[in-house]
Amino acid sequence: FTDTESITASTMVVTPLRGAATHDLVLDGGHDLFIEKVLIDGQQANERYQMGQGQLTIKNISKQSTVTIVNRIVPVNNTSLSGIYMSRGAFMSQCEAQGFRNITYWPDRPDVMSRFTVTIHADKTLYPVLLSNGNLVAEGDEADNRHWVRWEDPFKKPCYLFALVAGQFVAREDKIKTKSGREVLLQVWTEEKNYPNSEHALESLKKAIAWDEERWGLELDLDRFMIVATDDFNFGAMENKGLNIFNSRYVMASPSIATDTDYQNIESIVGHEYFHNWTGDRITLRDWFQLTLKEGLTVFREQEFTADMQPDESSRPVARIHAVPAR
């Protein structure tokens, strides 16, 4: 990353289907992608790819091959806010439903699932915090006051669950032990001014993780789980695997002015996005027609969580009644 543009290098290992009518690789591409080069097994492939309307076709991938596409994007000009965009000095992403194609050329469908390893390079002063999905596996410094980090998500996911955040944020964090005894790190990243208002979001995340273990036997499957709450996120809330992103208005609570309803709403919203870790992320969609399945099931789990967080059993029906007009 620089403050004006980003160079994206995506490398994918592609295996053709046996008996397929064609061995052409057709990738989706959005607006304002500027190709620098295309490589197949490390060799330039200028004669083997064609540009079409919203597509890049690479001809005759007849055996397992490593395809690398290097392209430029300009997040500061991305006013659609789909893909990676820049707002007030921070980079962030929104890829549901078809935003990943605005980052690089890719088979942008929910039934295409891949394991992602993401390396981010940026200026250390402007972008001290570099986040993506999964577990942090390596980091280091570079020349010219730059640094890099590498994130690895061990689980296959569709590209709409990819996330990236780079900017100046501070973290409220804690460590917990899962039911199986693993220690995991929980972090809520915010702009510095919002740090005092982030405590309830972290406590809500802890409650959601514990409840999912006890009620459904579903344990957090990563070494860390992160929430980013920023004033500049455009989507309200998004369940990216291991890196949930929220607009801060939905998860920040000032102890001096927040009401009981505010606290309950934050608990429900944080719970909802965390519960997608299994119902939506690990178990995902075949196509976008199934959106109602992952959202409906997760809303049900959220409502059960909210009811179970009530002070006594008699309050469960009240929580159910309140949930009806909300949905």
Describe the predicted segments one by one:
Residues 1-224, 249:
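Acidic/His-enriched low-complexity segments
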Residues 151, 180-327:
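Hydrophobic alpha-helical and helix-loop surface patches within well-folded domains
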